Regions:
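Export/targeting segments at the very N-terminus of extracytoplasmic proteins
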Residues: 1-11, 55-64
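A local structural micro-motif
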Residues: 1-3, 13, 41, 166
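Alpha-helical scaffolds flanking conserved acidic
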Residues: 1-7, 23, 71-76
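Proline- and acidic/polar-enriched loop/turn elements at helix boundaries
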Residues: 4-7, 17, 45, 170
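A short structural micro-motif
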Residues: 9-14, 81-84
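Short, surface-exposed glycine/acidic/tryptophan-bearing loops
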Residues: 16-37
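Extracytoplasmic and endomembrane cell-envelope/extracellular-matrix remodeling and assembly machinery
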Residues: 35, 39-67, 72-173
Length: 173
């Protein structure tokens, strides 16, 4: 079910960049991405790599779940940060997500609304026809991971592969 988090975070867009500089399908902040094994420097930013970012997000969500012992609080802390959620729990003396969000005093609106949006996305995604969505199944385009020993101009890669540069860029956010 957590696979639907990127639907809310980024609409599954690898190139998504928030006002706060969170990046990729999982919208990792730079420091959080690095803490969870993603490279982010002047040369490469793995937050935009859907495969690597998904592995990092699974690791991070598992850490948050261990920290809070509850998936709703883990998801809230994925959005608002674990420190913010811990402070809200301490100030309110409440350790249940729904009770914590019943007041506007402890967590910002974005974090209070985040878990219900994820849960709604899960319900709709599992029953699209029931909610008026006619989704046709698509077969993913086969791709292959290729690691190059050095930086290469994507125009040359596109030429070698016989595809458009835009296609190469889309596969290499």
């Amino acid at each position: 079910d957590l696979a639907y988090v990127p639907l809310i975070e980024s609409a599954f867009k690898p190139t998504a960049l928030s006002r706060a500089n969170a990046r990729g399908v999982w919208q990792f902040m730079r420091a959080t991405g690095i803490e969870n094994g993603l490279a982010a420097d002047w040369y490469i930013d793995e937050r935009a790599d859907p495969q690597k970012a998904t592995v990092a997000a699974a690791k991070y969500l598992k850490t948050l779940h261990r920290m809070f012992g509850d998936w709703h609080l883990a998801m809230a802390s994925y959005n608002g940060g674990p420190g913010r959620v811990q402070r809200a729990m301490k100030r309110s003396r409440i350790d249940d997500f729904w009770d914590l969000t019943s007041s506007t005093r402890f967590l910002p609106r974005e974090t209070r609304d985040y878990v219900p949006m994820i849960l709604a996305a899960i319900i709709i995604a599992k029953n699209p026809a029931q909610y008026g969505f006619d989704i046709l199944p698509r077969t993913p385009t086969p791709t292959e991971d290729v690691t190059l020993p050095a930086a290469v101009d994507l125009r040359r890669v596109a030429e070698w592969a016989g595809v458009a540069v835009d296609d190469i860029q889309q596969l290499n956010p």
